[in-house]
Amino acid sequence: RQVYAEQDLLLTYGKTNLHIFTTDSDRSENENSLCVLFDTENCDILITGDRSAYGERMLLHAGKIPEVDVLIAGHHGSKNSTCEDLLAAAQPQTVCISAGRDNLYGHPAAETLQRLENFGCTVYRTDRDGTITIRR
């Protein structure tokens, strides 16, 4: 069963904020993936879900993408996600990519890895590095 968020939501737990951003797209289910921002004293982490560059730009045009410390790459590092506009706005120092080893889709895509290198991001990948833990 899928549940759709109808509006943005902010949850606060002490000094940690959890922002849930929504957009409305009729292009595909992936474009309606929730975008989640963990905003803490020491580290801001952005997760854009399975959105493509189109969905990422929807968030950008709505003013929902701040600068962050860590970005979880969109759609497992596919070539159509984690676009240059998103990287320029978010300016992440670190990018984590969740992808299975030897997956059928070839994630993460070489184009995405090159974009991340061009932006000077430190990249961690579950297919290569295993479980990723972020501590600050």
What are these regions (language model features)?
Residues 1-136:
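Non-globular, low-confidence helical/coil segments that flank catalytic cores
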